[in-house]
């Protein structure tokens, strides 16, 4: 029959035909997707529920003028299964994948909340940083040359060649926000700040280096879009979703993106409400280091993991990259194509513009920061300097 786009009616038909519900079951279906690239349907017959996700052959945020390969759905399904191999407690269950229709049937996580929405609403997720730190350590270690035999790693790397979505990252994260491109989207009040950003040659040179790292460093399987909208949470659970951008890339990329989105939420808050975000930033890194170190000692397959002096070098390189990638994410989420509700939903215009200027300033400082001895306190320090006026855009 070939590919066709599902509707709420045909999604129910599909689910019944594939045995998820009885033929006579009264199944309620709603399209619940709020993302940029896919349809997401929730189906419920009162006794059980499932999620059907379908990749569209174009970017929903733009329309059919921006075509995309539906093969990204297969990459997403495979990534979730790889993640589940190492940390099943942190991802939804994949029930099935239909490559022809680009349909994946997965566990319904309605018991949880989208982490971005919860953080905006002031919800507390005390285990978020522990879970994400451990998730990242396991996935990055076990899919790299450190924890995977080189032959297996090369085969796996080939499975996650993801040109369409990597191109989106290359453009929307590393290129477009740093120059005059039609994809950019920002308030006129930011123009002077942006002009200064775009004329900063030192900044652009650093961004070029981070983009080149993304293009060339195939160190481990990365989620590729690990922001707080790609995570479901409750006080006791954390589930990482939507790895359709998954590819082989730098160790520090996902860490930087996650931290950047916590910083964006911190910028939307009053000073006395920011502490929990820095708790999560710092604990994410400490749990990552703790878990990565244990895996290095106990599970390393690369011969040089026996050299104790190499581990701190690897960890410092990961941290340095995470700092720069976080800076790029801050800037692109502020003036690029895909914004975040943390900033855009600040109701007072003056406060919103000020927060966005601070995001641009902080992003610039993180990208340009150079020190081989920095630690996780760097994010708190530069943030405080930025919001206090010590750093100007």
UniProtKB/Swiss-Prot annotation:
It holds the Pfam family APH. GO terms for molecular function: ATP binding; S-methyl-5-thioribose kinase activity. One of its GO terms (biological process) is L-methionine salvage from methylthioadenosine. ATP binds at residues 38, 53, 107-109, 242-244. Pathway: Amino-acid biosynthesis; L-methionine biosynthesis via salvage pathway; S-methyl-5-thio-alpha-D-ribose 1-phosphate from S-methyl-5'-thioadenosine (hydrolase route): step 2/2. Keywords: Amino-acid biosynthesis, ATP-binding, Kinase, Methionine biosynthesis, Nucleotide-binding, Transferase. It comes from the Bacteria. The keyword Cell cycle does not apply. It catalyses: 5-(methylsulfanyl)-D-ribose + ATP = 5-(methylsulfanyl)-alpha-D-ribose 1-phosphate + ADP + H(+). Its EC number is 2.7.1.100. Substrate binds at residues 225, 332. Gene3D superfamilies: 3.90.1200.10, Phosphorylase Kinase, domain 1. Belongs to the methylthioribose kinase family. HAMAP family: Salvage_MtnK. Homodimer. Catalyzes the phosphorylation of methylthioribose into methylthioribose-1-phosphate. NCBIfam families: MTRK. This is Methylthioribose kinase. It comes from Bacillus cereus (strain ZK / E33L).
């Amino acid at each position: 029959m070939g590919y066709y786009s599902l509707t709420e009616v045909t999604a129910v038909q599909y689910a019944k035909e594939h045995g998820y519900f009885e033929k006579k079951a009264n199944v309620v279906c709603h399209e619940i997707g709020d993302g940029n690239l896919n349809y997401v349907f929730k189906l419920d017959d009162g006794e059980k529920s499932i999620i059907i996700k379908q990749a569209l052959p174009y970017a929903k945020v733009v329309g059919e003028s921006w075509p995309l390969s539906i093969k990204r759905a297969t990459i997403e399904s495979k990534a979730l299964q790889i993640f589940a191999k190492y940390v099943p407690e942190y991802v939804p269950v994949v029930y099935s994948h239909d490559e022809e229709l680009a349909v994946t049937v997965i566990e319904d996580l309605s018991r949880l909340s989208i982490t971005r929405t919860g953080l905006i609403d002031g919800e507390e997720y005390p285990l978020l940083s522990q879970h994400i730190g451990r998730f990242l350590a396991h996935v990055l270690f076990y899919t790299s040359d450190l924890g995977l035999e080189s032959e297996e790693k090369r085969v796996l790397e080939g499975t996650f060649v993801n040109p369409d979505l990597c191109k989106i990252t290359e453009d929307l994260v590393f290129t477009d926000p740093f120059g005059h491109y039609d994809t950019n989207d920002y308030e006129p009040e930011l123009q002077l700040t942006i002009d200064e950003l775009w004329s900063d040659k030192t900044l652009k040179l650093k961004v070029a280096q981070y983009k080149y790292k993304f293009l060339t460093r195939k160190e481990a399987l990365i989620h590729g879009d690990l922001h707080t909208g790609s995570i479901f949470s409750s006080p006791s659970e954390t589930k990482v979703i939507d790895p359709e951008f998954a590819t082989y890339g730098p160790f520090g990329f996902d860490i930087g993106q996650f931290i950047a989105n916590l910083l964006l939420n911190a910028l939307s808050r009053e000073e006395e409400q920011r502490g929990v975000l820095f708790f999560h930033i710092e604990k994410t890194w400490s749990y990552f280091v703790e878990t990565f170190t244990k895996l290095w000692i106990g599970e390393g397959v690369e011969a040089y993991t026996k050299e104790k002096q190499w581990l701190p070098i690897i960890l410092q390189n990961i941290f340095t990259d995470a700092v720069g990638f976080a800076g790029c994410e801050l800037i692109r989420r502020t003036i690029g194509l895909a914004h975040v509700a943390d900033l855009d939903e600040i109701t007072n215009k003056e406060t919103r513009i000020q927060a966005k200027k601070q995001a641009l300033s902080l992003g610039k400082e993180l990208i340009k920061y150079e020190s081989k001895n920095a630690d996780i306190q760097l994010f708190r320090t530069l943030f405080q300097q930025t919001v206090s006026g010590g750093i100007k855009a």
